[in-house]
């Protein structure tokens, strides 16, 4: 049994991009789907899809630019043993605004840019650059 499914997702994406895979498959969950939606909106992945009824699987299609992965770093911030919450004024800026932080808020999972626009804070799930 996995203790941190989101960290597992991020590790699968990181490892798949390092070896040049075009897609990665993993067990699906609502939070993983929401994270994949943010990654797609921000242009870090090509697309994603969910297949299966009893045990749904999330397939993420990775994105490369001139043969290099678009995602240079993807790092878990808040974890089960140490939750990291930030209010709207304390939201992190990743690489001076060139990267994103994915935030779980009361209004859903979103990028730090969108959370600032809406004036909400929340749990900092991960950082992507």
UniProtKB/Swiss-Prot annotation:
GO terms for cellular component: ribonucleoprotein complex; ribosome. GO terms for biological process: translation. InterPro entries: Ribosomal_uS8, Ribosomal_uS8_CS, Ribosomal_uS8_sf. Disulfide bonds: none annotated. Keywords: Ribonucleoprotein, Ribosomal protein, RNA-binding, rRNA-binding. PROSITE patterns: RIBOSOMAL_S8. The keyword RNA-binding applies. Coiled coil: none annotated. GO terms for molecular function: rRNA binding; structural constituent of ribosome. One of the primary rRNA binding proteins, it binds directly to 16S rRNA central domain where it helps coordinate assembly of the platform of the 30S subunit. HAMAP family: Ribosomal_uS8_B. NCBIfam families: PRK00136.1. Belongs to the universal ribosomal protein uS8 family. Part of the 30S ribosomal subunit. Contacts proteins S5 and S12. This is Small ribosomal subunit protein uS8. The gene is rpsH.
């Amino acid at each position: 049994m996995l203790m941190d499914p989101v960290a597992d997702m991020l590790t699968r994406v990181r490892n798949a991009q390092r070896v040049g895979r075009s897609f990665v498959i993993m067990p699906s969950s609502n939070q993983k789907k929401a994270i994949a939606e943010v990654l797609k909106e921000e242009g870090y992945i090509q697309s994603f899809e969910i297949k299966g009824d009893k045990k749904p699987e999330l397939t993420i299609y990775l994105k490369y630019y001139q043969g290099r992965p678009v995602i240079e770093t993807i790092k878990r911030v808040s974890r089960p043993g140490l939750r990291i919450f930030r209010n709207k004024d304390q939201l992190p800026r990743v690489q001076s605004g060139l990267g994103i932080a994915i935030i779980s808020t009361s209004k859903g999972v979103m990028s730090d840019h969108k959370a600032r626009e809406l004036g909400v804070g929340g749990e900092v799930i991960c950082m992507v650059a």
